[in-house]
């Protein structure tokens, strides 16, 4: 059977083995007659991928690709976002947001290889992920059809989805009495739904799967030293590490101290607010350490402008327009700012908090001879008078005008 473009009637599905994508395989076959090729991206979720080969085939897929993209995930998506200092709405470290463009990119590559006419995903019609998947496909392969079952079928809730799965003897890793929606990768673990849908409900300690609840964390702080080269972390406690290993090791250390828990109500791109609880231990430490190094190495004008750029960068990533020319242009600016962001940062981890405990850099702009409160021989305090007179001249001129005109 051939599609309109002459390709085999195949669809490549972004597959996780979770509830949504487990039921999408039979649904695509029943409603579209597609041959379903599943693709699961190994983003660092570990043992969750082990049973997917058998599960996807048993559910009706003809083939499954399990793609190890961890290295690319860190070097091409996480590090640029870290260097930019991009944080969405002051809290969210974008763990799901920048994973989706990578998954969609790989879907496109497999679709080309297999001669598929369509790509399918399990994102709901209420969320941001549908936008992130589909904008990436539009940017990289505008001719491919996109199938989004949650916008088409009669299933209206996770409970309906569980019923659909059970009717077809499809095992799913959720229970009806606790149907959290979770997304896990090397960078973070997110939790949404169930009792979290009320912002008044405090997350229970048994929710956390990575981080130790802060009140149960060790009573003694732990110090970590992170070395950066041009904004990229390269050593942890003096040990040179690759990008994936850096995050894995720091995750274990920081999570043990309850660092990295984020509970927030965020503004979704599609217009509604949602509540999520995120566990991002390594990311929380790396962002804080990177920022401390920038305090030393960036001048005032560059730092302040970069802060504005970081806000826009975070919006671009969150909104799913990773492949927009503006993000690439901002990357070029950020790379210039990071040329001197090289040095060593010491951070203290204690019961959920991460605080700076020292920083040094060969490119530090902090000069003790100028900054000291003690006696110095390099700064003439009399010079400040002329600076103040010139800097304050516009304010003085306006005040004189207001006095003369009676406005004051």
Swiss-Prot record:
InterPro entries according to UniProt:
Arginosuc_syn_C (IPR048268), Arginosuc_syn_N (IPR048267), Arginosuc_synth (IPR001518), Arginosuc_synth_CS (IPR018223), Arginosuc_synth_type_1_subfam (IPR023434), AS_cat/multimer_dom_body (IPR024074), Rossmann-like_a/b/a_fold (IPR014729)
* EC annotation from Swiss-Prot or TrEMBL: 6.3.4.5
Please give the PROSITE patterns that the UniProt record associates with this protein.
ARGININOSUCCIN_SYN_1, ARGININOSUCCIN_SYN_2
Top-level taxon? Bacteria
Keyword field contains DNA damage: no
Q: Where in the cell is it found?
A: Cytoplasm
* Residues that hold L-aspartate according to the record: 124, 128-129
Q: Which reaction does it catalyse?
A: L-citrulline + L-aspartate + ATP = 2-(N(omega)-L-arginino)succinate + AMP + diphosphate + H(+)
The UniProt annotation places L-citrulline binding at 92, 97, 128, 132, 181, 190, 266, 278
One MF term in the entry's GO annotations: ATP binding
A single GO BP: urea cycle
Residues annotated as binding ATP: 14-22, 41, 122
Pathway field: Amino-acid biosynthesis; L-arginine biosynthesis; L-arginine from L-ornithine and carbamoyl phosphate: step 2/3
The UniProt keywords, alphabetically, are: Amino-acid biosynthesis, Arginine biosynthesis, ATP-binding, Cytoplasm, Ligase, Nucleotide-binding
Give the CC-aspect GO terms: cytoplasm
Q: How does it assemble?
A: Homotetramer.
HAMAP family hit by this protein: Arg_succ_synth_type1
* Family assignment from sequence similarity: Belongs to the argininosuccinate synthase family. Type 1 subfamily.
Q: What is this protein called?
A: Argininosuccinate synthase
Name the source organism. Heliobacterium mobile (Heliobacillus mobilis)
Name of the gene this protein is made from: argG
